[in-house]
UniProtKB/Swiss-Prot annotation:
Enzyme class: transferase
UniProt organism field: Geobacter sulfurreducens (strain ATCC 51573 / DSM 12127 / PCA)
Pfam families the record matches: NAD_kinase, NAD_kinase_C
Protein name: NAD kinase
Keywords: ATP-binding, Cytoplasm, Kinase, NAD, NADP, Nucleotide-binding, Transferase
Length: 284
């Protein structure tokens, strides 16, 4: 590994300081830091790299911040599948499981080829309007269809691999990966799914029926949701970061992505320990 991409929560002074130290550490070892352009502007005018160019150039990425910063970097890196080392400088750090104290020892191991990664399934989502695809994205966590603040419950006709599932009457719908199962889906009473599993979870948000419970599908399933509600404010949100307004008749197509996100694992803890310490899982 020669070229190391650096992403950080750009408006956080602590992240900026750690990024500056990391750049110096890499350069002292003859490595090439590729600093994302937005971050570079906060580091004394250092020349940065356009975000879209980084995946092609980098051999590895280091993300300084919280889970949101890592998720954003994962979507950007996409099909390149370079390993991502997430360093927790945020509040929760469920995905960014490497601590600041572990950063340089773990990075040394990565550079020598002695590291483990966990591969996380991603989803691709596209929106079809009047028979035409108007957008397409990849997500690591979830695809959310949600009503606006003043809208009534919405109708979402749903198919799985061409077979009718149901028409949800609810505040919204969450379609998540195993990684996303501990995010918004969990708050809506969705199941916790181990990240090594290959599946897609559909979780309704406040369904107007007692029988609409979350459902877990095999990963090869294709999910299509048609918005059937008129005159309501409805939005599509991807990983809680990218969004657009939906119109009646729009079809949202979701399927497993061809590529995965590769996260560098901490050798000092496992998934269940992270569940207990980060989410207080199993505590009374």
């Amino acid at each position: 590994m020669k070229k190391i991409a650096i992403f950080a929560k750009v408006h956080d002074p602590r992240c900026q300081g750690v990024a500056s130290e990391l750049i110096a550490w890499l350069e002292a070892r003859g490595l090439i830091p590729l600093v994302e352009a937005h971050l570079a502007r906060h580091l004394g005018g250092r020349q940065g790299i356009v975000p879209e160019d980084i995946p092609v150039l980098a051999d590895m990425a280091v993300v300084l911040g919280g889970d949101g910063t890592l998720i954003s970097a994962a979507r950007l890196i996409g099909s390149r599948q370079i390993p991502i080392l997430g360093v927790n400088l945020g509040s929760l750090g469920f995905l960014t499981e490497i601590t600041l104290d572990e950063l340089y020892p773990v990075l040394e191991s990565c550079l020598s080829g002695d590291f483990q990664v966990t591969e996380r399934m991603m989803l691709t989502v596209s929106v079809e309007r009047n028979g035409e695809e108007i957008c397409s994205h990849r997500v690591l966590n979830d695809v959310v269809i949600n009503k606006g603040a003043l809208a009534r419950i919405i109708d979402m006709e749903t198919e799985v691999s061409g077979i009718r599932l149901t028409t949800y009457k609810a505040d919204g719908l969450i379609i998540s990966t195993p990684t996303g199962s501990t995010g918004y889906s969990l708050s809506a009473n969705g199941p916790i799914v181990h990240p090594s599993l290959e599946c897609i979870t559909i979780t309704p948000i406040c369904p107007h029926t007692l029988t609409n419970r979350p459902i877990v599908l095999e990963s090869s399933s294709g999910v299509t949701v048609w918005l059937r509600s008129k005159d309501e404010d409805v939005y599509l949100t991807l990983d809680g970061q990218v969004g657009m307004e939906l119109k009646c008749g729009d079809a949202v197509h979701v399927r497993r992505a061809a590529h995965r996100t590769r996260l560098v694992m901490s050798r000092s803890r496992n998934y269940f320990e992270v569940l207990r310490t980060k989410l207080k899982w199993g505590e009374r």
